[in-house]
Amino acid sequence: MEQTIKDRILQIRKREMPEGYVKSVVGIVPADWKHYTFGDIYSERKEPGNENLPLLMVSIHSGVSDGKVDEDKLTKRTKQIEDKSQYKKAVTGDLVLNMMRAWQGAIGTVRTTGMVSPAYIVAEPDDKIYPPFMDYFTRIPRMINQIDRQSYGVTDFRKRLYWASFIIIDCILPPIEEQQKIAAILTTQDKVIELKEKRLAEKLRQKKYLMQQLLTGRKRLPSYWGEWNFPKAKEIFQNVTDKNHKGDLMVLSATQDKGIMPRNEVDIDIKYDVSSLANYKKVCQGNFVISLRSFQGGIEYSAYTGLVSPAYTVLSSKKELCDEYYKQYFKSANFINRLNVAVYGIRDGKQISFEDFGQLRIPYPPINEQTAIAQVLSAADREISLLRQDIEQEKQKKKALMQLLLTGIVRVNV
């Protein structure tokens, strides 16, 4: 970042006025940007929808959908409105917002003409604005904060943004040519993210295929051809209930995406009574854990030594094995499906017993083959992890670009 831009950011943070900037109702902005209200640049569209138009939805994450929504995924409330004439037509370039969730960011520009719920506001733009620019501009914190302030309700759950409140919201906009250039830069960044997300999806498909083939013996790695054994799980693992501790080990929780994790690193705030820790089970590094959601996400591996809820079942190995092989196998679709068949009837919140698990026949390849398979799958995991980090960096770059370009802190050459 150029030093002049760094200096400008520092000045604005100190509430000092950089050269070429002025103070406005929304903060410090470029002097040549113009002040409008939404009522100055939008008029309400009240055209009815019809059966031939695709149904569009607004997401707080991605704005307006650009194609037909899968109606099987709609809420019951949405499905109940069978008379599509109650829906509103939304034309390409219109601004659409969900009255009930606009304060959370459910707002965006229409890319494909369609129809939206009667609970949405549809606003038709005039020629002072470039619609793709507004798709980004309306979702920066400065604008969402204003929308939040103009939304009314006894609680957040009941907040609504009505047309009369929408039209008095302030916005400071650059000239149309600058709007177009900014939108082009952000659209290019979106395409970079989209391309990398497609690569990630392909890597995940490849990993899933490898798991289906290698973990079950359907496909063998070169130089491995011996027969596999398929003993019952209880012949490989044993149920361990170790409460011989002082309750001073770190408390762990099961997660479906990261395995067993320290409870203070889990996003969900899980309450527990410190006095009950004496009843918790000790889990050691290398153990596996059957949690209350294992029927849904498989069995979790613990890279930590600590304490877990007494509702969990802790597994330790009875035979020599490669931890990483079974870490991968217990998260495979093949195993989860078989586990569900074995415990048919168990619902969320019910424990899978060791007896149910122990009767399952699971693969037990030779140790050297377990290790080789684990190495292949771990390499795939590393590629996926690096790609996810790359995507997150691109998203952070987009976030920074939006904050700098859409507020005028950084100007573009037109």
Label every PLM stretch briefly.
Residues 17-50, 176, 222-244:
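Non-catalytic DNA-recognition/assembly elements of restriction-modification systems
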Residues 31-34, 134, 170-204, 208-209, ...:
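Amphipathic alpha-helical segments
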Residues 85-88, 92-143, 157, 279-335, ...:
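A short beta-sheet element
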Residues 18, 45-81, 109, 122, ...:
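DNA target-recognition patches
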Residues 23, 78-84, 155, 271-277, ...:
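Short, solvent-exposed loop/turn positions at domain surfaces
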Residues 18-22, 99-100, 114-121, 154-177, ...:
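A short glycine-rich beta-alpha junction/loop motif
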Residues 402-414:
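Acidic, low-complexity, intrinsically disordered peripheral segments
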Residues 27-32, 122-131, 149, 163-183, ...:
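Proline-centric
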